[in-house]
Amino acid sequence: MNLKKHLPWLGALLPIANTQAETKPNVVIIYIDDMGIGDIGCYGGKFVPTPNIDKLAQDGLLFNQYYSSAPVSSPSRCGLTTGLFPLEVGINTFLNDKAANKRCEQRNFLDDKLPSMARAFQNAGYSTGHIGKWHMGGGRDVHNAPSIKNYGFDEYISTYESPDPEPAITATKWIWSDKDSVKRWRRTEYFVDKSIEFVKKHKGEPFFLNLWPDDMHTPWVPEFKQKERKSWETQEAFAPVLAEMDKQLGRFIKTLDELGVGENTIIIFTSDNGPAPSFKSVRSAYLRGTKNSLYEGGIRMPFIVRYPKKIKAGQVNNESVLCAVDLYPTLCSVAGIKTEKGYKGDGQNYSKVLLGKSEAKRKTDLMWDFGRNKHFGFPGNPYDRSPHLAIRSGKWKLLVNCLLYTSPSPRDIS
């Protein structure tokens, strides 16, 4: 083959290939830990100004009927990752040590043979990264959890509740320590720094990034309160931590825009579950329920999407009911990529809804399972403690205290 003869043709094709790559949107999922829908200004929150998160809503689309897939960390994260209801993946409360997991009738880690949204993007040629809290397996006495790379991530940095925690933030086996080189009050700053490094490294190619900070989870430790353990769950400590998180997320979004990738980046902002403590339901916007509850305050979350290239700014959707399990098929559709081969998830493709082109009503029901036995962690206030099964169907939500197996033989029905 005469390469000199064909080089002009190859050169002519390169711009086309580059153009096609540039049209693939980047995806960033900002997944806050234990944030209530009433925490931030654009949802009516008044604790402290949250100008950067509010601007994200002003520049994009805010949803008022979005649900997490569970009222607590691990199953919520598994639902978003797999597009499956947590009941199907065998994880129904936060992953703990082996004995506690057994008492709560759950697995020790997310099965890496199950679907993974990141893997679908990786298969499509995206650079993939996870930065922040993991909590889908590993840590404590669970030493056989799969590597985060097994779920489709090229790069990762994670906290102690993971198979390979980052040394800078895990000097001890707890959420933070004075011995950590990155202090508790600088966690989101650190995660944003690492996220910016990831974006700069991959800005010439499509990327998929989880940015999952954990500082909205107690203990809240602003620098000036670092020695006052008794104040780490007070509103006085909460407010500056929220303000700092907003500041750092604003820095990240500004950097995306300065790097010229913001226009073609889908930013999802949401939370894994409801707040704890809720400060007398203020953090849940006065919805009943908190973290560890299937009432609305435990599972109805803030949800904002910014995608300047495709989403008209300043929109609010009050009608469409979305859930974390929908994100896998929906984001794949918006990005123009395929889900994994044989994928059959519980989530639905709501790409038109996500892009602000429709306020379509949900065609399938949602379900949640939490608290099936006495070993689960429940809200301290009995008013917030819910039945352990819930279904949302249309405008109705059913909460039930038991699940019956309907055998053909009536004598088996109890």
Stretches with model-predicted labels:
Residues 48, 141-152, 219-222, 231-234, ...:
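Histidine-centered active-site microenvironments of extracellular/periplasmic hydrolases
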Residues 22-61, 134:
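Active-site-proximal N-terminal segment of extracellular/periplasmic enzymes that hydrolyze or transfer
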Residues 192-199, 226-265:
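A long, amphipathic alpha-helix that forms part
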Residues 93-126, 134-207, 213-225, 237, ...:
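Formylglycine-dependent
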Residues 24-27, 59-64, 124-129, 154, ...:
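Loop/turn elements at helix/coil->beta-strand transitions in domains of secreted/extracellular proteins
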Residues 405-414:
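Single conserved hydrophobic/aromatic residue that forms the stacking wall/gate
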Residues 81, 158, 162-177, 250-259, ...:
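Substrate-binding rim/cap in mid-to-C-terminal beta-strand-loop elements of soluble/periplasmic
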Residues 46-77, 83-87, 127-129, 151-160:
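Short, structured active-site-proximal loop/turn typified by the sulfatase FGly-forming signature C/S-X-P-X-R
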